[in-house]
Curated annotation (Swiss-Prot):
Compositionally biased residues, Low complexity: 261-275
Subcellular location: Host nucleus
Role according to the record: Plays a role in the initiation of viral DNA replication. A dimer of E2 interacts with a dimer of E1 in order to improve specificity of E1 DNA binding activity. Once the complex recognizes and binds DNA at specific sites, the E2 dimer is removed from DNA. E2 also regulates viral transcription through binding to the E2RE response element (5'-ACCNNNNNNGGT-3') present in multiple copies in the regulatory regions of the viral genome. Activates or represses transcription depending on E2RE's position with regards to proximal promoter elements including the TATA-box.
DNA-binding domain: annotated span: 298-385
Stretches for region Disordered: 189-282
Gene (name only): E2
Modifications made to the protein after synthesis: Phosphorylated.
Ranges of compositional bias, category Basic residues: 225-247
Alphabetical GO biological process terms: DNA replication; DNA-templated transcription; regulation of DNA replication; viral DNA genome replication
This protein's name: Regulatory protein E2
Organism: Canine oral papillomavirus (strain Y62)
UniProt-annotated stretches for the region Transactivation domain: 1-199
Gene3D superfamilies recorded: 3.30.70.330, E2 (early) protein, N terminal domain, subdomain 1 (1.10.287.30), Papillomavirus E2 early protein domain (2.170.200.10)
Oligomeric form and interacting partners: Binds DNA as homodimer. Interacts with protein E1; this interaction greatly increases E1 DNA-binding activity. Interacts with protein L1; this interaction enhances E2-dependent replication and transcription activation. Interacts with protein L2; this interaction inhibits E2 transcriptional activity but not DNA replication function E2. Interacts with protein E7; this interaction inhibits E7 oncogenic activity. Interacts with host TAF1; this interaction modulates E2-dependent transcriptional regulation. Interacts with host BRD4; this interaction mediates E2 transcriptional activation function.
Pfam families in UniProt: PPV_E2_C, PPV_E2_N
Length: 385
């Protein structure tokens, strides 16, 4: 058991080092998938020995580890083949070589430079489907030689040239038969560039974290099925100001009133502790006493967003090297559903909370601890811990 734990720790340290390097080398991406395969093999072996948990990490069923190991092997074969092509020296990020990116349409091709295309089907203004137009598509010809083509948009659909043949990987007419009764469709927007990597932390591109699929949070995938028109807000729920909501503690379900601003500083009542809905500002008004009184309303937290296994690696490292700098860490979790604003929570990535005793402890933590660029970090607060 101890040897298994040491082996898993070593693999995860190597993976976390790769994420921190933010490498654009295809050789490093090949190494990344090799490490993922080894991790799944180790977990498969551990479950076969009846081990349910290694350290803080649950051991999945053997069928899960086996399937993910096979995916990692297949991914490695494609990347290693690309390594021997004329495109090997191009910049390749973890996003570009992710599993989800590889199997997205057109399937089993590498893709770069996604742009979103919204198409409305039928007569309903809200019956909109989002697709991705890939600027560069790398495919294998009949001789298994890698070639590069540019994605195209026309009235018929999204396509690329496979040699001398134009291949449509999205056919709008076929999609119209699926999503509408009239067969009508309308392309709503000219291609608008979507960054293939998004801001991470305070700056820098976002890369996927460590996941068994290797997809991470950076992939651009089409939004299948009818959806609400972008920018449209449902009228079922009233609009509420403030950057952060809170769950009620029973009763009528109405939001508790906000504490009214006062001309003088006074401590919060027991009913007001944890009652603020907006993040604290960094204003120094009121001095240290004012800051402490403000902190009494909301215990401070940090929210880490990224790939779930990458967050687990970070939690492991924090528990061993920075244990005294924070109060506690949560398990990883994801947004699973929501209304119009759900997409901004990036349901493809996981979240993990770090709790602190005070704002000052949180700032000291931020000054001393660094995170890989694949992980976004932002501040928040909770009613209680």
């Amino acid at each position: 058991m101890e040897k298994l734990s040491e082996a898993l720790d070593l693999l995860q340290e190597e993976l976390l080092s790769l994420y921190e390097q933010n490498s654009q080398s295809l050789a490093d991406q090949s190494r990344h998938w090799s490490l993922l395969r080894k991790e799944q093999v180790l977990l498969y072996y551990a479950r076969g020995k009846g081990i349910m948990r290694i350290g803080m990490q649950p051991v999945p069923p053997q069928s899960v580890s086996q399937a993910k190991a096979k995916q990692a092997i297949e991914q490695s074969l494609y990347i290693d083949s690309l390594l021997h092509s004329k495109y090997a020296n191009e910049p390749w990020t973890l996003c570009d070589t992710s599993r989800e990116r590889l199997v997205a349409e057109p399937a089993y091709t590498f893709k770069k430079g996604g742009k979103q295309i919204d198409v409305r089907y039928g007569d309903s203004e809200e019956n909109i489907v989002r697709y991705v137009l890939w600027l560069d598509i790398y495919y294998q010809d009949e001789f298994d030689t890698w070639e590069k083509a540019h994605g195209k948009l026309d009235h018929k659909g999204l396509s690329y040239m496979h040699g001398t043949q134009q291949v449509y990987y999205v056919d709008f007419e076929e999609e119209a038969n699926k999503y509408s009764e009239t067969g009508k469709y309308e392309i709503l927007n000219q291609p608008t560039t979507i960054p293939t990597t998004s801001a991470a932390g305070t700056s820098g591109p976002e890369l996927p974290g460590h996941s068994a699929s290797g997809s991470g949070a950076c992939s651009l995938t089409p939004r299948k099925g009818p959806s609400r028109r972008p920018g449209r807000r449902s009228s079922r729920f009233p609009r509420r100001s403030g950057g952060r909501g809170r769950l009620g503690r029973g009763g009528s379900g109405e939001l508790p009133p906000q504490p009214q601003p006062s001309s003088s500083w006074s401590p919060p009542s027991p009913q007001q502790v944890g009652s603020k809905h907006q993040l604290r500002t960094t204003s120094s008004a009121g001095g240290r006493l004012g800051r402490l009184l403000q902190e009494a309303y909301d215990p401070p937290v940090l929210v880490l967003a990224g790939d779930p296994n990458s967050l687990k690696c970070i939690r492991y490292r924090l528990s061993h090297k920075h244990r005294g700098l924070y109060l506690g860490a949560s398990t990883t979790w994801k947004w699973t559903s929501g209304g119009d604003g759900a997409s901004k929570h990036d349901r493809g990535s996981a979240r993990m909370l770090l709790a602190f005793l005070s704002d000052q402890q949180r700032e000291d933590f931020m000054d001393r601890v660094t995170f890989p660029k694949s992980v976004r970090v932002f501040r928040g607060g909770l009613d209680e811990l």
